[in-house]
């Protein structure tokens, strides 16, 4: 298939490229920019006049719910949601049922995802067997099966000796370790930030130190072992300050925040809105603003969707009993553009947080509009406005705290491996 994407504003965040030009695609690759190569005859022309042409989005945290939780979502529904949101590559955490701790499970997931011919799926393998925090997994075998990193997902690893050994082993072979800083004891049974809203509503609190105590331990172990660690979904101002300082000292870490936490705070819980029951919890306005500044100054490397589809019944329960999580694949682009507009960040820099930077963290060939790059492309209308209507989302999970919000930026075309997989 040969495709010409004609007359669009081509944005390549990795090179800060931003100009109106044509993009030519053949055999799954971008073969030329600006002028067609000799003998090129397009089978399909996409009119991108007044549209933005950028790399397909790369999402660092998207739960696809297979295997084990198909009653919440399926690969079919969530892959459709991904490409509708312009997401062409995504990393899925290992907290499935059973967890992704055996090569066969990883291979099965990869095979199922490939058969759908939509977004690329990059599994994150379990760091410990069964995510129990006791014995480390066979990382080499999981890597051979298709894992790109190793994590405990949201399951805390309370034994620092096990964490030390896992990081030493990963460091020896150069395996990336992804961790969400969380001290389980300090936030035991908590469901909301330890602030004025939790106090007013009588919700069990999760204090800031539940993140920062764990983060301090991780940073010390990184310095001790030299492991390559990515810190997932930070939520506190103090945590961002610690990362900023660690990076200034040359400690080898990267981090991301969720799009939810870039825009929302504990105040959005209102009167027990379970759609705002998230992990980590929505924190104070001060924390939210610190995440936004961290993304702006480069302390925060990437923004993820933290896509977590939840069945409707689990969100209808009282806040403290409801299941945490929010759907996000179809909102990631618009929420990133909204942050960029509000923070007065150039479009190239805003899009870098969901394209070239997460691709760098994953270590994959993605997130670029350049000759020779894989033709994973998002074409969106930056001027289009749309209302978040949960019933119209492709994801099986309709749970979102942004229901009713008006968003900017609408995906018109998504290409994966040079094929149009979504047109809206």
Residue ranges: model-predicted function:
Residues 103-120, 168-179, 335:
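Alpha-helix-loop-beta-strand connector modules within alpha/beta enzyme cores
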Residues 49-113:
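Metal-associated gating/positioning segment near the N- to mid-region
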Residues 318-321, 374-424:
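C-terminal cap of metal-dependent C-N hydrolases
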Residues 1-40:
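N-terminal metal-binding scaffold of metallo-dependent hydrolase/deaminase domains
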Residues 200-228, 275, 294-303, 308-383:
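His/Asp/Glu-enriched, well-ordered alpha-helical/loop segment
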